[in-house]
Amino acid sequence: MAVYTEVTDEALAAFLAEYDIGTAVAFRGIAEGVENSNYVLRTTGGDYILTLYEKRVDPNDLPWFLGLMEHLAARGITCPQPVRGRDGQALRMLCGRHAAITGFLPGVWPRKVQVAHCHPVGEVLAKLHEAGADYAPTRLNALGPEGWPPLLAICRSRADEISPGLGEELQKALDRVLTAWPSDLPAGHIHADLFPDNVFFLDDRLSGVIDFYFAATDALAYDIAIALNAWCFESDHAYNITKGSALLRGYNAIRTLTEAEKAALPVLCQGAALRFALTRLFDWLNTPPGAMVTRKDPMDYVHRLRFHLSAPNAGAYGL
């Protein structure tokens, strides 16, 4: 989450007039994240999140995202629910951006990931996959393998500003990953961004999952690879196999991985690390000055990528 578009008090008041949730009492931007403009909104009717959609989000995809959240919540996944206006619509325009209000989930995300967090994260990811199985609409993963070559092409000429030789290293990794990428794994709807700041805990229990705006239809095990990258590396870039094992056990307790998924885990993790290295590289080089957004170091994911390229099999992840 982040803030790129500033919302005036007058614009907010006019926007809220379309809803039955009261008038604004407090309103503040959220600096964490990199994609959309997000605000915590307190009204006389309760607490909410206001999101203005920016950058990579295609407005045509927004009904799919909001529909998925409603679908998952109806099947027991605790996630934000879109708030519909008096006209029954969840989407409308604000300050030149498509915008929506969702409910506020209690809890905090873990600033320091512990092993105890990882098992419930694996569980909720598997539950999410199962709950989404009967959501009929599909959405192409725009940041899947087909999206990586154009991203690298945009950034390669400046990649060495981050680290000498980085452009060539990423190109070699991309060529290797695309050659080995599996095409026949079990597929469904994936979260695709299950980072610690998108998972809330309350009283040491997982209390909710947020930020479905990268969700797509893709290989389910790719979502696991994203989660392993996000939850199971230490600050010194070392993979924590104890955390990885806990996450994988949690997932397998709900949905058992196939042998093909297990065999593909190293290349899926390579692809996941490459995807986030590339998007972070793009954002690092292109974030507008003064934006209320936290830039994230692409090298964190380059280090992860190097680990995955050396991983011989799924056993390296604790499976």
From Swiss-Prot:
A GO MF term: homoserine kinase activity
The cross-references to InterPro entries, in alphabetical order and at most eight, read:
Aminoglycoside_PTrfase, Homoserine_kinase_II, Kinase-like_dom_sf, Pseudomonas-type_ThrB
The record lists the catalysed reaction(s) as: L-homoserine + ATP = O-phospho-L-homoserine + ADP + H(+)
Which biological process, per GO, is one annotated for this protein?
threonine biosynthetic process
EC number(s): the record gives 2.7.1.39
**Pathways involved:** Amino-acid biosynthesis; L-threonine biosynthesis; L-threonine from L-aspartate: step 4/5
Query: Is Nucleotide-binding found in the keyword set?
Result: yes
Top enzyme class, one word, equals transferase
* SUPFAM superfamilies according to UniProt: Protein kinase-like (PK-like)
Keywords (alphabetical) are: Amino-acid biosynthesis, ATP-binding, Kinase, Nucleotide-binding, Threonine biosynthesis, Transferase
Q: Name one Pfam family in it.
A: APH
Regarding protein family, the annotation reads: Belongs to the pseudomonas-type ThrB family.
The protein's name is Homoserine kinase
- Gene name on record? thrB
